Design a protein with these regions (language model features):
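Membrane-interface helix-boundary signature
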Residues: 4-21, 370-377, 381, 416-419, ...
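Residue-level signal for the membrane-embedded core of alpha-helical transmembrane segments
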Residues: 21-24, 28, 71, 241-244, ...
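Hydrophobic helical membrane-anchoring modules
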Residues: 9-16, 48, 447-464, 468-472, ...
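N-terminal membrane-anchoring/stem segments of glycan-assembly enzymes
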Residues: 1-63, 250, 431-438, 484-500, ...
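Non-transmembrane catalytic domains and loops of membrane-associated enzymes and transporters
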Residues: 47-370, 383-386, 499, 514-520
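Long, highly hydrophobic alpha-helical transmembrane signal-anchor segments
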Residues: 4-5, 9, 13, 297-299, ...
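Membrane-proximal soluble regions of multi-pass membrane proteins
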Residues: 342, 346-359, 468-517
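Membrane-embedded multi-pass helical conduit in multi-pass membrane proteins
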Residues: 39, 380-496
Length: 520
């Protein structure tokens, strides 16, 4: 009798859980296929426009807005001079560069002083957003390019990247600012392309684009001149992941006006709107709107997501008819970590930051005034990004345990049809999503007169590179996904325990990739 009761209970549990886990994987991959379908046409249009638009018209236009490039720097003594040198030679008619030394403990400030002949000065500092104490301000005395109005260096007490960005915003004299990482590489056309979007649609308060992986590319004079595959397998898996996330994920969400993240590596913002929304979130920000939305002395380890979600909320609460946009082709290149410990730190921080952003703005869920953000984008992130790791792991454990019970104890809980459907939904369909994402990113679209020219989003030089990447797209669900699942779960556990902090990881530096871009 006891055995029969155990069998009955186990069978009942199986009947309840089977459709739950199968439904989750079907829903997730269906969601991704929807974004791929939405993004494919957008990518084709943008690829064609990317190569036929005459962006030089921006140079002579009275409507071209000046920009401020805000560069937070913490212990960047090795790369900061090269990074700033590349920035001041960017192709844009009018801009200034503000480097914020966030209390570096190395020689970052001194190498900047020597390279750009910095002179201490008392420049206007608008204390619009609360920050850590600014110790000194410097301006460059070297001869700058004609289109660069000034190069400013702020030396402040250490308080994190978000606080450094706020200090840069306070110093900015332009209506728009660019947030970027000190170790990123900008595409030569990036600034003009993003500001062209702002000119065409004045409703845009923030715009970003795809961040591509620089590992394996050939870099010359601070520019990516040839796209290749990284030599390390972890970086190749990340390339598949970035294509799925940026090329299809965010491009598809952009079609729905529902982009929730613009990468902190590179994005353009309307300054006054960001100031009115309270700036980047730190415990030092004392702003009525920030306190209303997230509480007093709140902070986050993923400022790039939180500021975008808060801007969506602020725009729909106060401004209406404004939007946040995304470009599918690469506007910046960044080095991704190749060591597992560095990847663990990065993914754990991302998961903690995701939780913070979602919980801070949970009042937006299913509220009519927030439109697709409240009814589609945020619920999707809650289900697939926040609860997803838990549901995924539980689903795998469920199948494994019940298969063991059936094999060892002869308790028929799982039927063969369900097991096949589960594997197809979780692994087979997931692999198909990866393959589609790579094809959208690497496919050569025709453009120009009579469609004679061909170009892809990521212009790989060899077809072999694309085939190798497709192989990694197939393998991703079997090797890479289980590791990221573990890191995401660990990140959630750290968040529940109240862990904070960036856990900054060491980078190899672009020197490894200069003139050595290996294709395989």
């Amino acid at each position: 009798m006891n055995g029969e009761r155990v069998t009955a209970i186990a069978s009942a549990i199986g009947l309840v859980l089977q459709p739950v886990f199968l439904g989750y994987f079907l829903l997730y991959n269906g969601y991704m296929l929807l974004l791929i379908a939405l993004s494919a046409g957008q990518v084709r249009r943008r690829v064609a426009g990317h190569f036929i638009e005459d962006l030089d018209l921006i140079d002579g236009s009275d409507y071209t807005k000046p920009l401020t490039m805000v560069v937070p720097a913490f212990n960047e003594e090795v790369t900061i001079v090269d990074s700033v040198t590349n920035l001041i030679h960017c192709d844009y008619p009018r801009f200034e560069v503000v480097v914020v030394n966030d209390g570096s403990s190395d020689e970052t400030l001194n190498v900047l002083k020597q390279a750009f002949r910095l002179r201490r000065t008392d420049l206007p500092y608008r204390d619009a957003i609360g920050t850590a104490r600014v110790r000194a301000m410097y301006e460059a005395t070297i001869l700058l390019p004609k289109n660069v109005s000034q190069l400013i260096v702020i030396d402040k007490e250490n308080a994190g990247k978000a606080d450094a960005l706020n200090a840069g915003i306070n110093t900015s004299t332009s209506p728009y600012f660019v947030s970027l990482d000190a170790d990123s590489i900008l595409d030569q056309r990036a600034l003009k392309e993003l500001m062209r979007m702002v000119q065409e649609d004045p409703r845009i308060v923030a715009v970003g684009g795809q961040v591509a992986i620089a590992n394996g590319c050939t870099i010359r004079a601070g520019r990516v001149v040839s796209v290749g595959l990284p030599s390390h397998p972890w970086a190749r898996f990340q390339m598949v992941e970035y294509l799925r996330s940026f090329t299809t994920g965010r491009t598809g969400l952009d079609r729905l006006d529902s982009v929730l993240i613009l990468s902190g590596v590179f994005a353009v913002f309307e300054k006054e709107t960001v100031i009115r929304a309270g700036g980047y979130l730190t415990p030092l920000v004392q702003h009525k709107l920030v306190e209303e939305y997230v509480g007093r002395r709140a902070g986050t380890v993923c400022e790039d997501m939180e500021i975008i979600v808060r801007l969506h909320r602020f725009v729909r609460d106060k401004l209406r008819s404004r939007r946040i946009a995304f470009l599918p082709h690469p506007v910046a290149w960044t080095e991704v970590p190749e060591k597992l410990e560095s990847l663990r730190k990065q993914r754990g921080r991302w998961q903690r930051g995701l939780r913070e952003s979602l919980f801070y703005h949970r009042d937006m869920l299913f509220r009519r005034k927030y439109g697709r953000i409240g009814w589609f984008a945020l619920p999707s992130f809650w289900l697939f990004e926040y609860y997803g790791p838990i549901l995924e792991l539980t689903g795998y454990i469920f199948v494994a345990v019940f298969l063991i019970m059936e094999r060892i104890f002869g308790i028929p809980i799982l039927n063969e049809q369900y097991a096949v459907a589960f594997l197809l939904a979780s692994l087979g369909w997931g692999t198909l999503v990866n393959v589609f994402a790579v094809l959208v990113g690497a496919w050569r679209f025709r453009y120009g007169l009579a469609d004679r020219l061909q170009r892809g989003l990521l212009p790989f030089n060899r077809k072999r590179d694309v085939l190798i990447l497709l192989g990694y797209a197939v393998l991703e669900n079997f090797f890479w996904r289980p590791m990221t699942l573990y890191w995401r779960l660990r990140g959630l556990w750290d968040a529940w325990r109240g862990k904070s902090g960036w856990e900054k990881f060491a980078r190899q530096g672009f020197q490894k990739h200069v003139e050595t871009g290996r294709a395989a």
